[in-house]
């Protein structure tokens, strides 16, 4: 898909579309366990947000926003011929889901929030985003992996998961990671949207998520009418990578209930 840039995706399976939106500073490869495990029940499409993975950017110094990412998701759905989709988003991808719901509600069949939150950043968190943007711009991605890598996993991550996380983080261009950080800093607070979401919702959260404690996620899910909440054991902030079997089972059960 070309419009001064290209948006990449990877797909497997057939049938109604189940789309996946990755977190920061990752790419579509984080969903490999879902592409392989859920292709029998849906046409699974893992997207690269602009600048990530195989997707390009249209400026040397990009400026991102959750709304811009949401519009890109809608464009990708157009490109694959999907009027509607079940859409999953992890962490930053969950922030994109909230924007997608506000901007393109007609494209959403159901929402699957994973290891994310509805609240906007606190002043302290916003300052942290700015430090992250400055750090990657000056030092590259290795220091970010060194600080963030151990925090996104649970207590017993496999070497394979750690290696995949490291590869994705180091493959992300510093200017893209910086733009991500500032976009997350500036995202809207979505707590007021929770009781107004009218499509089916599944909220998955790693029991060992140290970045976004599970109790806050459970409380947010409880504000969405009819939402189902599932805790993923042995999962941290990237639960779909750490425990793909439990994640896939929860998603399969949810989709069967629609």
Question: Positions of the model-derived regions?
Answer:
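Catalytic active-site module of serine/aspartate enzymes centered on a nucleophile-bearing elbow/loop
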Residues: 227-258
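Short beta-strand/loop motif that positions the catalytic acidic residue
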Residues: 197, 203-205, 209
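Flexible "cap/lid" loop of the alpha/beta hydrolase fold
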Residues: 98-146
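Alpha/beta-hydrolase fold catalytic core
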Residues: 1-19, 39-43, 78-83, 171, ...
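Active-site glycine-rich loops that stabilize anionic/oxyanionic intermediates
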Residues: 15, 23-26, 91
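Conserved alpha/beta-hydrolase catalytic His-Asp/Glu region
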Residues: 121-127, 138-196
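Active-site loop/oxyanion-hole signature of alpha/beta-hydrolase fold enzymes
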Residues: 12, 32-39, 45-88, 249
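Gly/Ala-rich beta-loop-alpha elbow adjacent to hydrolase catalytic centers
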Residues: 89, 93, 97
């Amino acid at each position: 898909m070309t419009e001064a840039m290209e948006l990449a995706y990877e797909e497997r399976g057939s049938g109604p579309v189940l789309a996946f939106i990755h977190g920061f500073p990752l790419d579509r490869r984080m969903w490999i366990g879902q592409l392989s495990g859920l292709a029998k029940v849906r046409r699974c499409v893992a997207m690269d947000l602009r600048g990530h993975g195989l997707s390009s950017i249209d400026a040397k110094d990009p400026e991102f926003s959750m709304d811009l990412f949401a519009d890109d998701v809608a464009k990708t759905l157009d490109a694959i011929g999907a009027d509607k989709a079940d859409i999953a988003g992890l962490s930053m991808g969950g922030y994109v889901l909230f924007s997608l719901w506000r901007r393109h509600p007609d494209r959403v069949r159901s929402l699957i929030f994973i290891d994310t939150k509805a609240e906007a950043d606190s002043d302290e968190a916003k300052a942290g985003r700015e430090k992250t943007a400055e750090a990657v711009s000056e030092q590259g991605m290795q220091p970010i992996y060194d600080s963030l890598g151990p925090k996104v996993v649970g207590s017993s991550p496999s070497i394979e998961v750690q290696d995949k996380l490291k590869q994705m983080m180091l493959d992300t261009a510093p200017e893209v990671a910086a733009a991500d950080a500032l976009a997350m800093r500036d995202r809207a607070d979505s707590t007021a949207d929770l009781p107004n979401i009218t499509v089916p919702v599944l909220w998955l959260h790693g029991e060992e998520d140290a970045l976004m404690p599970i109790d806050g996620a459970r409380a947010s899910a409880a504000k969405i009418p009819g939402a189902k909440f599932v805790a993923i054991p042995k999962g941290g902030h990237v639960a779909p990578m750490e425990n793909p079997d439990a994640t896939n089972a929860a998603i399969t059960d949810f989709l069967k209930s629609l």
